[in-house]
């Protein structure tokens, strides 16, 4: 293995990085830069024999300011660079910026698990990523949606808390147990608010009686249009309300000019897989999420 050196990028390095990355990788990195999810000084460059051989980037939500995830954009030929050293370099940077935890995502069959485990990350959960190219007309008769802005903030936090009850998503359950239901709901809303979004995208499902029964929060997460949060009250589940909310979200996003919408679901959350499939979301890939507590 070549002796490696690492440093943080500068604005002047971006053209060099672009020339070294694949077209797909550069597009992803440029999206993170465009939406202020990363910045040049959060990009870690690894050099071997004087040549750029590896690139990592710390990223966060647009308005959050503290790194939440690590993205890898370039790996040199096998054995050329000490990737573990690069990860430690990135971790120390995140720690110095005040991060409490970091996430890293790899494909389901990734060979990187030993490396990221060596960097201190622990397997967090398995995730299924879905993609939709257009809404399905599966509205529930007699139900409507309203903008989240029509409700008091306390009402929205309470609705998120209620729709998170008995969740099959292990991440939601982890933070509910650690923080408590209402604190987790408040954190969820705050995280969504740190992303790029239009308040008109966020919808609450309303029953004929006027009672709110569910909520969906589409956002631009790391530059991509995704379902940031969706939930239905436990007593209303299994009656296509999730499909109704997904359809409402898609209508709004389509009007905003988006041609694709993504959603991610815990592999254990079978009911959400069904709702996504019923709403014409197709499985795109399976991933592993790893988490490091700092």
Residue ranges and their predicted role:
Residues 21-49, 57, 171-207:
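Active-site rim helix/loop that mediates acceptor-substrate recognition in acyltransferases
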Residues 79-92, 232, 238-251, 255, ...:
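Conserved acetyl-CoA-binding loop-helix of GNAT-fold acetyltransferases
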Residues 108-125, 243, 267-285:
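Conserved active-site alpha-helix within GNAT-family acetyltransferase domains
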Residues 102-106, 227, 261-265:
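Conserved hydrophobic beta-strand within the GNAT/NAT acetyltransferase core sheet
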Residues 76-144, 149, 288-293:
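Acyl-donor-binding surface of acyltransferase catalytic domains
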Residues 1-30, 140-182:
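Short amphipathic alpha-helix that is part of the acyltransferase structural core
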Residues 21, 30-92, 212-225, 233:
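Conserved donor-binding loop and adjoining core beta-sheet/short helix segment
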Residues 9, 73, 230-232, 265:
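Hydrophobic adenine-recognition pocket in adenosine-nucleotide-binding enzymes
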């Amino acid at each position: 293995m070549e002796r490696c050196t690492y440093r943080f990028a500068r604005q002047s390095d971006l053209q060099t990085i672009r020339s070294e990355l694949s077209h797909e990788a550069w597009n992803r990195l440029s999206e993170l830069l465009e939406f202020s999810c990363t910045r040049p000084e959060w990009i870690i460059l690894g050099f071997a024999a004087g040549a750029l051989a590896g690139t990592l980037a710390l990223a966060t939500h647009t308005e959050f300011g503290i790194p939440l995830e690590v993205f890898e954009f370039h790996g040199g030929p096998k054995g050329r660079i000490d990737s573990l050293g690069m990860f430690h370099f990135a971790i120390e940077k995140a720690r110095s910026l005040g991060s409490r935890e970091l996430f890293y995502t790899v494909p389901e069959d990734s060979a990187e698990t030993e490396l990221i485990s060596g960097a201190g990350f622990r397997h967090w959960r398995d995730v299924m990523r879905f993609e939709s190219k257009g809404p399905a007309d599966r509205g529930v008769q007699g139900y409507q949606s309203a903008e989240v802005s029509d409700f008091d903030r306390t009402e929205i936090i309470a609705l998120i808390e209620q729709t998170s009850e008995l969740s099959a998503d292990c991440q939601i359950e982890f933070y509910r147990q650690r923080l408590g239901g209402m604190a987790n709901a408040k954190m969820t809303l705050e995280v969504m608010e740190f992303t790029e979004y239009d308040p008109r995208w966020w919808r609450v499902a309303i029953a004929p009686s006027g009672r709110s029964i569910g909520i969906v929060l589409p956002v631009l997460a790391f530059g991509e249009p995704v379902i940031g949060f969706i939930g239905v009250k436990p007593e209303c589940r299994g009656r296509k309300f999730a499909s109704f909310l997904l359809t409402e979200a898609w209508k709004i996003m389509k009007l905003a000019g988006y041609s694709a919408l993504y959603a991610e679901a815990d592999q254990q959350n079978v009911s959400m897989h069904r709702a996504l499939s019923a709403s014409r979301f197709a499985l795109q890939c399976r991933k592993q999420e790893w988490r490091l507590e700092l």
